[in-house]
Amino acid sequence: MESSENGVLELTDRYLALWSETPGTPPGHLRRFSAAGKAEKEREVNLLLEKSLPEMDRFGEMEEGDRARYLGRAHTALGKLMTGEGDPAADRFFTECESAGKMFVRRAKKFDPSLSDDDIHQALRNQWVFNSIQSSLSHPVTLTPSSLGYSLMYPCTDNWIDGAGHTPAEKDRFNQSLKLWLEGEPVTGKESGDGGFRELLRMIESEYPREGYPAVYMSLLAIHRAQQRSLILHGPVEDHGEAFLQSLTIEKGGTSVAVDGYLVSGALGPEALQALFGYGVVLQFIDDLQDMREDTSAGHSTVFTRAGRTGPLDGVTARLINFTCDTIRLLNGLSPGGGISLSRLIEGSCIFLILEAVARYSHLYTGAYLRAVEEFSPLRLSYLGGLHDRVRTNLASREHLLFSA
């Protein structure tokens, strides 16, 4: 199966069917945490925050690159605390990710000094996904030219499209130019800048020449198509069925992480492509749950904003937890050399991000559901929701960066 339009359609339909068949009931197979276990984890988090206070206090005085590096370290430390549990393989992976992240921030700021903390962290999130795939496929965990190029590609182009001074016609021409550049075609006519896109694309081409790695560029075209189609979700959707709307989300999420897989190894077998596509779908659904407030304010349609109009989010969130577990397990056995599988670590990280969103949006859930799901949380939900507020107090408007997926 390839990242052709037909291949993407087949994968989208497969995961749409899996999502529809997944029960919206509390999971019965996740690890449960005792009250004593939660209390111990909370003590560890408190200690972590206390150690971070000196840097938090001078956060606003830091250069943007230093702030991004600090947030990366905080993300790593929290991830180790919540999911690593002293596993040497997990500890090594987090250490390697932190090293790659530091290098990423330096290279990103060198490429474009105007990139904001938000831009860098958005791009760094993809680098972490890329690193997790490297480890799952028994590749060294590191920054590569193509991972830097792809991770920065959409923050840079989004900034161009969202920036002032460009007419709708110019933005439409720019999107058409993006497609042609991805296809390797020359673009004629005057261009009022390209958002750095062509230079980033050249980073990918330096590692994966077009003539030798056509699947890499098919995957890049697939995510470009998916992003364009998903713009339907930014407007009125009443004329579209629920399955169609879900398919737009699934296609966008799946193709975005499939690109990472191709950039790790240059080619993917059908099993690896299916597993990584599913990984991307999970991350997209989690993003949508975490962004519930912002999407509602902006009028963007997601499975969660639509469900929230008719009642509590109990069922759709329970479905997401079950879907996450079923899908992430497909990452098992991807390593051709019998290397370490990170599926358990990835599953734990994803579940924690879902629970953090539940804690923040507790008013959107019934008391019965909150009590049921708290059994699977390493922290009390009341503590987890308050933790978000504590970080916000110290980092002001930057608080969401630490807890973003």
Q: Which role fits each region the language model picked out?
A:
Residues 352-405:
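Acidic, carboxylate-rich catalytic segments that either coordinate divalent cations
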Residues 287, 310-316, 381-383:
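Alpha-helical membrane-embedding segments
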Residues 87-153, 159-160, 164-177, 181-296, ...:
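All-alpha helical catalytic cores of prenyl diphosphate-utilizing isoprenoid enzymes
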Residues 299-312:
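Nucleotide-sugar-dependent glycosyltransferase catalytic core
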Residues 73-81, 181-182, 200, 204, ...:
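Hydrophobic core of alpha-helical transmembrane segments in multi-pass integral membrane proteins
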Residues 186-215, 313-358:
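Primarily interfacial, aromatic-capped hydrophobic alpha-helices that serve as membrane anchors
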Residues 1-147, 156, 222, 226-238, ...:
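Conserved N-terminal diphosphate/IPP-binding helix and adjacent helical/loop segment
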Residues 251-255, 280, 341-357, 368-375:
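Alpha-helical transmembrane segments of multi-pass membrane proteins
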